[in-house]
């Protein structure tokens, strides 16, 4: 009957959607892998052209200059990334359960003559105040290698940034630059830029929304359920 073959479209469609999600998941995993490889590629000199920077997120760059520790910003709460595992685990958090903050410091790039923002890395809660980690407040010109990051928009359930208290919950470059006077250029310093007593670098998380496995289970589950219902109703009742 028409109804019999019409209802067969339901398991056929859900099977097709499940298969499509399998392909989408593979594409997303390859994209994450590609971005992760950028974070370990040979660094290039930091470009100053905003148009060029906008296409370089997660690209490793290098620059020489000096930190201005008097204008530190704090993104919190943050858990530490395990630098040794980050490249292959695409952003998985460390299992220590410890929380603290990422220290964002203006950095004057000598050869470009501009000041940018550098995420020096993670400090535990008890070390957020700079006077508790004076050994790590390095002075003088140095080379920093890191990863270009772009501005963020506030995600659902993430609090608004509290500029007055210097509590930042997401990377709002426009607001951060208004406070510090820096250019809207942001770099996550890598683990090799860590200095004794200072923040732990290498806090870049390669994060892309990847919920395809949930959709795969959902669509294939619906396919199995509706296939069984169709078989029970239309096939078991006739002689094969």
Curated annotation (Swiss-Prot):
One of its GO terms (biological process) is mitochondrial cytochrome c oxidase assembly. It is found in: Mitochondrion inner membrane. The keyword Repeat does not apply. CDD domains: SURF1. GO terms for cellular component: mitochondrial inner membrane. Keywords: Membrane, Mitochondrion, Mitochondrion inner membrane, Transmembrane, Transmembrane helix. Its main location: mitochondrion. Pfam families: SURF1. It comes from the Eukaryota. The keyword Transmembrane helix applies. PROSITE patterns: SURF1. The chain crosses the membrane at residues 2-20, 215-235. May play a role in mitochondrial respiratory chain complex IV assembly. Probably involved in the biogenesis of the COX complex. Belongs to the SURF1 family. This is Surfeit locus protein 1. It comes from Takifugu rubripes. The gene is surf1.
């Amino acid at each position: 009957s028409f109804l019999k073959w019409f209802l067969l479209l339901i398991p056929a469609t859900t099977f097709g959607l499940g298969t499509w999600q399998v392909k989408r998941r593979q594409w997303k995993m390859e994209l994450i892998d590609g971005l992760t490889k950028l974070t370990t590629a040979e660094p290039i000199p930091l470009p100053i052209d905003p148009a060029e920077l906008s296409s370089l997120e997660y690209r490793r760059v290098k620059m020489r200059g000096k930190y201005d520790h008097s204008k530190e910003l704090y993104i919190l709460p943050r858990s530490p990334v395990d630098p040794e595992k980050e490249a292959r685990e695409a952003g998985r958090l460390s299992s220590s359960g410890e929380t603290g903050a990422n220290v964002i410091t203006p950095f004057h790039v000598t050869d470009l003559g501009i000041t940018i923002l550098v995420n020096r890395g993670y400090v535990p809660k008890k070390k957020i105040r700079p006077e508790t980690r004076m050994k790590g407040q390095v002075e003088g010109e140095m080379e920093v290698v890191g990863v270009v990051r772009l501005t963020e928009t506030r995600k659902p359930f993430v609090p608004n940034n509290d500029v007055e208290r210097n509590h930042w919950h997401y990377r709002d470059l426009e607001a951060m630059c208004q406070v510090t006077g820096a250019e809207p250029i942001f770099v996550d310093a890598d683990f090799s830029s860590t200095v004794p007593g200072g923040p732990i670098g290498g806090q870049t998380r390669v994060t892309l929304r990847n919920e395809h496995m949930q959709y795969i289970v959902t669509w294939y589950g619906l396919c199995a359920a509706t296939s069984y219902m169709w078989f029970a109703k239309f096939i078991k009742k006739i002689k094969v």
